[in-house]
UniProtKB/Swiss-Prot annotation:
EC numbers, comma separated: 3.2.1.196
Catalytic activity: Hydrolysis of (1->6)-alpha-D-glucosidic linkages to branches with degrees of polymerization of three or four glucose residues in limit dextrin
Superkingdom of the organism of origin: Bacteria
Recorded metabolic or biological pathway in which this protein acts: Glycan degradation; glycogen degradation
Single Gene Ontology BP annotation: glycogen catabolic process
Keywords: Carbohydrate metabolism, Glycogen metabolism, Glycosidase, Hydrolase
Protein name per its UniProtKB record: Glycogen debranching enzyme
Keyword Hydrolase attributed: yes
Annotated disulfide bonds: none
Gene3D superfamilies noted in UniProt: Glycosidases, Golgi alpha-mannosidase II, Immunoglobulins
Renumbered residue ranges of the record's region Disordered: 460-479
Active-site residue numbers: 336 (nucleophile), 371 (proton donor)
């Protein structure tokens, strides 16, 4: 190969122009950067990057082609106390690599050293980057742009969703291709889903600790290459990008948006004892929040924290997000531990990354969802994100469970959460859709486990059941575990119905965990991040068709209720909502705080949710008018009820007049 030309300092990463490849890498503190390319025989060829524009190192390799494997060796000081951990003996991944060849195994050679550098060369076993071409024929693809008020989110894992689906071809189960298969798309459409939210698809690594136990990181919240698709979800790693885009194109044709769960808060390099893959060896002090002693601020619980207040790291994160939108046509993002995005180090609404997103004509137009906390002091920021963001509403989750499973929540608190938690989100011009309401998520009990287990059962995770939260607000209804008498099964079913109804008929944006509509159980494991097995894969052969139909009917009912889809805050007297007691009268102040758990919610003056969350059968006097129960609480032809509904214990019903 010829020598490197100077090339251009932008864009970041490796880009093929038809004649060769331009390489760029950011590093403030590097003293020298070597581009290492590998031929078909694995022979390494090294080139110093000749260009150095500001903090960007760059060079152009004529005649280089897509498929070229490469990495970097970065020279600089080894000064751990100052936060510098350069080690040119270690081959490093380009942070903007679009494809990775090789596996991130637990190997001592993939570590830089702790106090002293490990100068053993690792190029023979280190994963390599691959130059790719982004071109793709999108045909007439267009984003669905579903209004927030009409959005129904379905949180799913690429593999877990389809790996056991009997109607999907065996060879594509558990892959990106399966997401775009007609069977899966038809299912999502029939259910009423408008947005498929995928757990992380950017390439991730399994922690060495898990590998030593024979486990793996299943969820994917351990990123190593944020621009590259995780190859294990592809039928062929070389075609992963096209397989993913094929699926998105098919979902878009069906009117379904795709939202990516993205991890912009830490990397798979973990703590100082963790592996060296990329950022730590490129510019540790710039990419991460570093303490005065040279160690990491661990505001994520994962060993390190990305410094998203550094201008270059903001540019990197912004470029990553734009890549997924522009190259893959994704419709939005859910940001894991998103409080990190606003750290300066204190949390600010005008933090640099938030400002960059706000000012970006691409990113400001997609759906943005925050998990609004991290584990550091001041990390709980629910309701405090900039107006462009919606946020996971843990207030809703806890209130719904407490009301239906613990019976210890006043009506006033329940109603506040039902009304999109306006006390939290009605500020800065935000709409009710800013509240992402959920009862369950990937992290925690499944819906079925909420009604079958009082305690977590995480022994399979190898941490002696110490991991996972103990604050589940669950209720096993008298017996720990699945199964039981017919009466027990029916009481659990009623609780599931109540929780689903609360989720899907409340104001705000509902998010349904994949499998909850099946009755999927993880057998009490509320932290199944390392369980890539039948514990987490959805078993479609065991899915409850009745529960699926119930869920679909609720979603389609929601779409008929103007008060829920118009995305306007409810105001007294506007006809959107009336809160009534069991006698169809407005609730008194005392009833709101101390009254029995009986409530009628009249929506759009036509739809009535009658709730009896007590343990006794109770007569509920309906408002004036001719009412009939509607699906999924009754068939299509139902007798008119003009006066009283016999509310079963711990039950609810929806009527229309």
């Amino acid at each position: 190969m010829t020598q490197l030309a100077i090339g251009k300092p932008a864009p970041l990463g490796a880009h093929y122009d038809g004649q060769g490849v331009n390489f760029t890498l950011f590093s403030v503190h590097a003293e020298r950067v070597e581009l290492c390319v590998f031929d078909a025989n694995g022979q390494e060829h090294r080139y110093d990057l000749p260009g150095h524009s500001g903090d960007i190192w760059h060079g152009y390799l004529p005649d280089a082609r897509p498929g070229l494997r490469y990495g970097y060796r970065v020279h600089g000081p080894w000064q751990p106390a100052e936060g510098h951990r350069f080690n040119p003996a270690k081959l490093l991944i380009d942070p903007c690599a679009r494809q990775i060849d090789g596996e991130f195994k637990d190997n001592p050679l993939l570590h830089a050293g702790h106090n002293e550098p490990d100068y053993r060369d690792n190029a023979a076993i280190a994963p390599k980057c691959v130059v790719v071409v982004d071109h793709y024929d999108w045909e007439d693809d267009a984003p669905p742009r579903t209004p927030w008020g009409s959005t129904i989110i379905y949180e799913a894992h690429v593999k877990g969703l389809t790996y056991l689906h009997p109607e999907i071809p065996v060879e594509i189960r558990g892959t990106y291709k399966a997401l775009g298969h007609p069977v899966m798309i038809n299912y999502l459409k029939q259910l009423g889903i408008t947005a498929l939210e995928l757990l992380p698809v950017a390439q991730f690594a399994s922690e060495p600790r898990l590998q030593r136990m024979g486990l793996s990181n299943y969820w994917g919240y351990n990123p190593v290459a944020m621009f590259a698709l995780h190859p294990a979800y592809a039928c062929s790693p070389e075609t992963a990008l096209d397989e993913f885009r094929d699926a998105i194109k098919a979902l878009h044709k069906a009117g379904i948006e795709v939202i990516l769960d993205i991890v912009l808060n830490h990397s798979a390099e973990l703590d100082l004892d963790g592996p060296l893959f990329s950022l730590r060896g490129i510019d540790n002090r710039s990419y991460y929040w570093i303490r005065e002693d040279g160690d990491y601020h661990n505001w994520t619980g994962c060993g390190n924290t990305l410094n998203l207040s550094h201008p270059a790291v903001v540019d990197y994160a912004s470029a990553c997000l734009r890549y997924w939108v522009e190259t893959c046509h994704v419709d939005g993002f859910r940001f894991d531990l998103a409080a990190v995005m606003g750290r300066t180090p204190e949390f600010r609404q005008d933090a640099p990354l938030f400002t960059a997103i706000q000012n970006c004509p691409v990113l400001s137009q997609v759906k943005l969802i925050a998990e609004p906390w991290d584990i550091a002091p001041g990390g709980y920021q629910v309701g405090n994100f900039p107006p462009l963001f919606a946020e996971w509403n843990d207030h809703f989750r806890d209130a719904a469970r407490r009301f239906w499973l613990h019976y210890d929540l006043p009506l006033g608190a329940f109603a506040g959460r039902f009304a999109a938690s306006s006390d939290v989100f009605k500020r800065n011009g935000r709409l009710p859709s800013a509240a992402i309401n959920l009862v369950t998520a990937h992290d925690g009990f499944t819906l079925r486990d909420c009604v079958c287990f009082n305690h977590k059962h995480n022994e399979a995770n190898g941490e002696e059941n110490r991991d996972g939260t103990n604050n589940n607000y669950s209720n096993n209804h008298g017996k720990e575990g699945l199964g039981g008498t017919l009466d027990l099964v029916e009481r659990r079913r009623d609780s599931i119905h109540a929780l689903l109804t609360t989720l899907l008929l409340s104001q705000g944006t509902p998010m349904l965990l994949a499998g909850d509509e099946h009755g999927h159980s993880q057998h009490g494991n509320n932290n199944a991040y390392c369980q890539d097995n039948q514990l987490t894969w959805l078993d479609w052969s065991q899915a409850s068709s009745g529960l699926t139909a119930f869920t679909a009917a609720l979603i389609h009912l929601r779409k008929r209720i103007p008060a829920l889809v118009e995305n306007r805050w409810w105001e007294e007297g506007d006809g959107n909502v009336r809160w009534l007691n069991r006698y169809a009268q407005p609730l008194s102040t005392d009833e709101w705080q101390n009254g029995p758990k009986q409530l009628q919610i009249l929506l759009s003056d036509r739809f009535l949710i009658a709730i009896n969350a007590t343990l006794e059968v109770t007569e509920i006097v309906l408002p004036a008018g001719e009412w009939h129960a509607i699906p999924p609480f009754a068939g299509e032809d139902n007798p008119v009820i003009t006066a009283v509904w016999q509310g079963p214990a711990h039950g609810l019903c929806v009527f229309q007049r």
